């Protein structure tokens, strides 16, 4: 392995694993994703040997062990760095009371967003298993955030903890929405006329309402424009219900991992 070899970036979220092989300048050589469910392994068979692997893992020890085994099977003894949030990195300052308690995915995502929209105040909304919000000032100061149940989790919880409501999965709920909320938003409030649509639309609008409320509150507090950046597995559904301007970015965590890798390489003198 040479200093010019690419980095392998791995984002292990609660529902799936995303990865990318990138060069030192951030150019992507290859990328992929796979769910935690099932026995599938990442297809790294045709990839060149990376200099190091970088992992953000919020999915637990079993997933970490699975990733380590996959790496060792393809590239024995490849160095693996599992990132943790810290007080300051890549121009972002962490205001959490205990900086290391912040999820590594949120930390890497903020680093990626700060670099992608340099000089802008941001509200970052990620719609995954959990919905997370981060308020990030233009100077890189993360002032705090929120965590709520994600879109799919909201629907599943209602089905599992009530006697008569159906348990909707994401696939079924997407079919029920079918652009109806966005269309209704142009003509008036949306009220469904059957239980499954009431549930799917209600959870979608709950997500959108949270984001819109915090975006408006943040602009009122800071008295400056704030860019709303959205991402995550349920971004299509929730973004369709938003009535405020927003920008989509699908690779914030991987982008942040690339920046962390580059900063560490400079520190090592590579």
Curated annotation (Swiss-Prot):
Q: What does the entry list under GO cellular component?
A: cytoplasm
List the GO biological process terms.
Answer: coenzyme A biosynthetic process
- Pfam assignment, any one: Pan_kinase
The lineage's top-level taxon is Bacteria
Which GO terms fall under molecular function for this chain's record? ATP binding; pantothenate kinase activity
Spell out the reaction equation it catalyses. (R)-pantothenate + ATP = (R)-4'-phosphopantothenate + ADP + H(+)
Please list the residues that bind ATP.
Answer: 11-18, 129
What's the top EC group for this one? transferase
CDD domains listed in its UniProt record? ASKHA_NBD_PanK-III
Active-site residues per Swiss-Prot or TrEMBL entry: 105 (proton acceptor)
* Pathway(s) annotated for this protein in UniProt: Cofactor biosynthesis; coenzyme A biosynthesis; CoA from (R)-pantothenate: step 1/5
**Location in or out of the cell:** Cytoplasm
What does the UniProt function comment say about this protein? Answer: Catalyzes the phosphorylation of pantothenate (Pan), the first step in CoA biosynthesis.
Q: What is this protein called?
A: Type III pantothenate kinase
Organism of provenance: Paraburkholderia phytofirmans (strain DSM 17436 / LMG 22146 / PsJN) (Burkholderia phytofirmans)
Q: What is the lineage of its organism?
A: Bacteria, Pseudomonadati, Pseudomonadota, Betaproteobacteria, Burkholderiales
């Amino acid at each position: 392995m040479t200093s010019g070899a690419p980095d392998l970036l791995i984002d292990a979220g609660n529902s799936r694993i995303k990865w990318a092989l990138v060069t030192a300048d951030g150019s992507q050589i290859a990328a992929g994703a796979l769910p935690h469910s099932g026995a599938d392994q990442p297809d790294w068979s045709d990839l060149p040997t990376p200099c190091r692997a970088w992992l953000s893992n919020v999915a637990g020890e079993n997933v970490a062990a699975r990733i380590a085994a996959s790496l060792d099977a393809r590239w024995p003894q490849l160095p693996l760095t599992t990132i943790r949030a810290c007080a300051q990195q890549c121009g972002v300052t962490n205001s959490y009371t205990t900086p290391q308690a912040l999820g590594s995915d949120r930390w890497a995502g903020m680093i990626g967003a700060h670099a992608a929209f340099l000089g802008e105040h941001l509200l970052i909304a990620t719609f995954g298993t959990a919905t997370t919000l981060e308020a990030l000032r233009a100077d890189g100061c993360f002032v705090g955030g929120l965590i709520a149940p994600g879109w799919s989790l909201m629907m599943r919880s209602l089905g599992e903890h009530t006697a008569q409501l159906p348990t909707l999965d994401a696939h079924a709920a997407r079919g029920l929405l079918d652009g109806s909320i966005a269309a209704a938003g142009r003509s008036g409030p949306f009220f469904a006329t059957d239980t499954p649509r009431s549930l799917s639309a209600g959870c979608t609008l709950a997500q959108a309402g949270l984001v819109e409320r915090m975006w408006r509150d943040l602009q009122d507090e800071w008295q400056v424009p704030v860019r709303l950046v959205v991402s995550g597995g349920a971004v299509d559904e929730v973004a369709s219900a938003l009535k405020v301007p927003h920008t989509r970015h699908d690779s914030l965590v991987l982008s942040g991992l690339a920046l962390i890798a580059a900063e560490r390489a400079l520190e090592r003198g590579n």
